[in-house]
Design a protein with these regions (language model features):
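Cytoplasmic-side transmembrane-helix entry/capping segments in multi-pass membrane proteins
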Residues: 106-112
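Membrane-interface alpha-helices at helix entry/exit sites of multi-pass transporters
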Residues: 35-46
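Anion-binding (especially nucleotide phosphate/pyrophosphate-binding) glycine-rich loop
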Residues: 55-58, 62-104
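Membrane-embedded alpha-helical segments that form the functional core of polytopic membrane enzymes
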Residues: 1-15, 84-90, 175-180
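Membrane interface segments of multi-pass transport proteins and intramembrane proteases
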Residues: 158-172
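Conserved small/polar residues in nucleotide/adenosyl-binding loops
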Residues: 210-217
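Transmembrane alpha-helical segments of multi-pass membrane transport proteins and ion-pumping complexes
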Residues: 12, 16-23, 49-58, 63, ...
């Protein structure tokens, strides 16, 4: 039980580090263009990250990312030391990349930490390889998808604004930056808030598996003793 508490505390620490690691992404444009002050922008982003939880629960109706994170390792191989090792690795890597200013994905770091710890403990049979390969594919696909979508939107915006006077465009774009920042923060909250839920869910599964008696133990305890 003590180890479970340690993991939950580290999971919350991971979420905190992930917050200051990624917070700048959603507020960079509204701060650099002086739409909001840095303090106002942080409050803006924090509010919409918080709102994202309720969107996931009451509108989307599920926490798919949390389930994916918790199912990275095959259930029978999930142990608290594996989860602890994965979380510590993710925290360490997030701090290193933040310190060096290197963009990185906390989701992929966390899942990689779980997978590495499980492979070290029990071999490749301990991981859900199909899930991990699907996740790894988006490390390479995401930048290209973002580039193509941004390219298309830029063409659309330039076409719409081709006859708009610059001062009018500036007024509208400042307002739209608030909308885009809010949407970015909601997306960040939908994605990243669930990772900690996945860590805690996996830890609780491991704790239950460790403390629950196996069917063999139960059947053995019920066998009458021979005289």
């Amino acid at each position: 039980m003590e180890l479970l508490i340690v993991i939950i505390v580290l999971a919350l620490l991971f979420d905190f580090i992930n917050g200051f690691h990624d917070a700048a992404n959603s507020i960079a444009t509204i701060v650099s263009t002086k739409v909001l002050t840095p303090f106002q922008a942080v409050l803006w982003a924090a509010f919409f990250n918080f709102v994202a939880f309720f969107i996931a629960k009451y509108i989307i109706g599920g926490f798919g990312i949390a389930n994916t994170v918790s199912k990275t390792v095959v259930e029978e191989f999930i142990t608290l030391p594996i989860i602890l090792s994965g979380v510590i690795a993710a925290i360490a890597w997030n701090l290193i990349t933040w310190w060096k200013g290197i963009p990185s994905s906390s989701s992929h770091t966390l899942i990689g930490g779980f997978a590495g710890a499980a492979i070290m403990a029990s071999g490749f049979g301990a991981i859900q390889l199909n899930i991990i390969l699907k996740i790894a594919a988006f490390i390479f696909l995401a930048p290209f998808i973002g580039m193509v979508v941004a390219f298309g939107f830029t063409i659309l915006v330039l076409h719409i604004c081709r006859r708009v006077q610059p001062h009018k465009a500036e007024v509208w774009f400042k307002k739209l930056q608030l909308v885009s920042s809010a949407m970015f923060s909601i997306g960040h909250g939908l994605n990243d808030s669930q990772k900690v839920m996945g860590i805690i869910a996996a830890a609780m599964i491991a704790c239950l598996l460790y403390t629950s008696p196996s069917p063999r133990d139960i059947s053995g305890s019920r066998m009458p003793s021979s005289a």
